């Protein structure tokens, strides 16, 4: 299904210039050599696969920069899935199986959160699993978003206009409040929120950690649920995570060969959906929110080209002073920055962004990506929130 267009590469190396990983990691050959150049060799002999492709962080900034529309990131991810014979480690299993880890951790969240914050536990994880002890581990919620949603499902069904919410792992296991904030905002626009009948992790962590077959199975399952919402019920699907949105729309057909034809155009980021409704005449009774905020553009948001919608939505909040940070990778790249061997590179990639944030004088940082939030809050002194949360606060 995927046409990576690797033969269209004109060898200009602008992709390497845009690559945050090759800038700080001399062990990574860069997207041109790892992507279209390497693909020509791999097609002749798969034994020419370069293990250094594991250093690609799949940010897609190479694809944004490419003047020939070569899908460089897709080439690299597909090559890793096809040629890499390395058996995934226990560490990579734990980092990538977010539904499993979330389902076993949320019932014991207070204990899990306390334990993973202890220095001896983090040192043990570093020694035994190579999860870097310097990395702050995400906190789990005591109870999932889906469980909470049952208490409001009947109320949500009363609204004439409906959307389906792909909540993702972050909202379900780590931060249900974001899902509650979204419901509050959509209800203020006379729109009810449904959940998909069955939802699994979007699959991005699985792809990144060598579990491509598992990611494909989950994608097929998710597409069935998406089709039920879009084609059967006739309602759009929205997500608060820029990476989940990107995966559902683009990674499924381009990397996993899972057909989402007829669905893709009905899947969008929550901020984009909200802005389109406001632009069409809907209103939100927003109160002043006197905050100085800076917005960080996630890499996959940059790839989709949807930053404008979030920015215009934030500008609707009275009293909000908004500054857009330079578009650059924060460095965490999902599970990449949790790994001991990648931690120094992860922090080096993000260092310019961290400096800009600290020098901004902002009250908080705003972004549409949950892992960017984790990285920014760990690496700076600033709190980081989702734009939907600010809208919910402005509603009072």
What are these regions (language model features)?
Residues 1-6, 42-53, 187-189, 316-319:
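Short, intrinsically disordered, charge-biased short linear motifs at domain edges
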Residues 3, 8-10, 14-39, 50, ...:
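Iron-sulfur cluster-binding cysteine motifs and their immediate structural context
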Residues 72-396:
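Iron-sulfur cluster-binding electron-transfer modules in prokaryotic oxidoreductases
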Residues 43-47, 61, 93-97:
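A ubiquitous short alpha-helical element
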Residues 1, 27-47, 305-313, 347:
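Short, charged low-complexity linear segments at domain edges
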């Amino acid at each position: 299904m995927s046409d990576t267009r690797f033969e269209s590469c004109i060898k200009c190396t602008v992709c390497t210039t845009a690559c945050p990983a090759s800038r700080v990691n001399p062990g990574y050959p860069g997207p041109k050599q790892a992507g279209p150049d390497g693909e020509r060799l791999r097609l002749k002999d798969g034994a020419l696969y370069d293990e250094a492709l594991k250093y690609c962080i799949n940010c897609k900034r190479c694809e944004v920069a490419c003047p020939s529309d070569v899908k460089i990131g897709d080439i690299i991810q597909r090559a890793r899935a096809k040629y890499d014979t390395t058996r995934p480690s226990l560490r990579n299993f734990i980092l990538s199986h977010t539904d499993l880890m979330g389902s076993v951790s949320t019932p014991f969240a207070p204990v899990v959160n306390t334990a993973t914050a202890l220095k001896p536990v983090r040192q043990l994880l570093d020694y035994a699993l190579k999860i870097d002890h310097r990395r702050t581990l995400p906190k789990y919620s005591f109870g999932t978003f889906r469980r909470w949603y049952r208490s409001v499902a009947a109320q949500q069904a009363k609204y004439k206009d409906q959307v389906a919410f792909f909540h993702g792992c972050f909202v379900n296991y780590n931060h249900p409040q974001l899902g509650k904030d979204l419901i509050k905002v959509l209800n203020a626009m006379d729109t009810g929120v449904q959940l998909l009948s069955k939802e699994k992790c979007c699959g991005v962590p699985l792809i990144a950690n060598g579990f491509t077959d598992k990611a494909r199975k989950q994608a097929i399952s998710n597409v069935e649920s998406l089709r039920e919402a879009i084609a059967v019920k006739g309602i759009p699907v929205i997500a608060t995570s820029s990476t989940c949105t990107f995966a559902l729309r683009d990674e499924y057909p381009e990397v996993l060969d899972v057909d989402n034809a007829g669905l893709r155009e009905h899947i969008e980021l929550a901020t984009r959906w909200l802005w389109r409704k406001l632009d069409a005449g809907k209103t939100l009774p927003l109160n002043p929110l006197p905050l100085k905020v800076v917005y960080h553009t996630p890499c996959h948001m940059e790839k989709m080209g949807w930053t404008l919608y979030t920015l215009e939505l934030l500008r609707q909040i009275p009293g909000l002073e908004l500054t857009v940070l330079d578009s650059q990778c924060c460095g965490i790249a999902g599970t990449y920055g949790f790994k001991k061997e990648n931690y120094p590179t992860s922090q080096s990639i993000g260092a310019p962004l961290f400096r800009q944030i600290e020098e901004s004088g902002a009250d908080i940082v705003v972004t549409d990506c949950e892992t960017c939030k984790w990285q920014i809050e760990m690496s700076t002194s600033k709190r980081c929130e989702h734009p939907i949360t600010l809208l919910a606060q402005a509603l009072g």
